């Protein structure tokens, strides 16, 4: 979409118009994967909201996302309750996880979205690899955009360090968490 050293504009992406896009939670997913023993546990958050402000120059665009940590869902009520506790998210005292972008830059046909991720009142910088999926119209005639994004983080960086030691020096839960997003957002009038 952009050559090195040039600016990506909405005019270089067919159908994309500058404006504010609201994340459509019914057609989007925010999820994570973490190692548990020899397998991986996958989870999602059921309640979230977000806004993407697309500027004429893509590099000036911004995004903000807010996630209700109590809405974590891993297909196990017992595990979900533990994740909401002070051992992990402490959702009662720190109910939201937020992401605020600080920069977006093209990388080949994709993008890198840099921003500040806050969990349990700890804010750290992360970079998300973003694949822009395109522009279309939904059933209501609204302009919609779609993308997939992902990053890997160390949960310990946010003070989420609960674990159970196992024989041989192993731990029950991995430190690395893969975050993945599938997002559809609609242009607001």
Regions found by a protein language model. Name each.
Residues 1-189:
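Low-complexity, acidic/polar, glycine-enriched regions of mature
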């Amino acid at each position: 979409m952009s050559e090195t050293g040039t600016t990506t504009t909405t005019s270089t992406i067919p159908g994309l118009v500058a404006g504010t896009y609201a994340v459509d939670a019914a057609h989007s997913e925010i999820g994570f994967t973490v190692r548990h023993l020899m397998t991986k546990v996958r989870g999602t958050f059921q309640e979230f909201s977000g806004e993407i402000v697309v500027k004429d120059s893509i590099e000036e665009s911004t995004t903000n996302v807010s996630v209700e940590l109590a809405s974590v869902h891993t297909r196990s009520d017992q595990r979900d309750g533990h994740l909401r506790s002070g051992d992990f998210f402490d959702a009662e005292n720190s109910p939201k996880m937020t992401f605020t972008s600080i920069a977006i830059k093209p990388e080949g046909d994709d993008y890198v979205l840099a921003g500040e991720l806050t969990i349990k009142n700890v804010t750290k910088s992360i970079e998300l690899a973003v694949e822009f999926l395109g522009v279309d119209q939904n059933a209501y005639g609204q302009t919609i955009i779609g993308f997939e994004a992902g990053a890997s983080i160390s949960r310990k960086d946010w003070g989420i360090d609960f674990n159970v030691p196992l024989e041989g020096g192993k731990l029950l839960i991995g430190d690395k968490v893969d975050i993945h997003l599938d997002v559809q957002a609609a242009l607001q009038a």
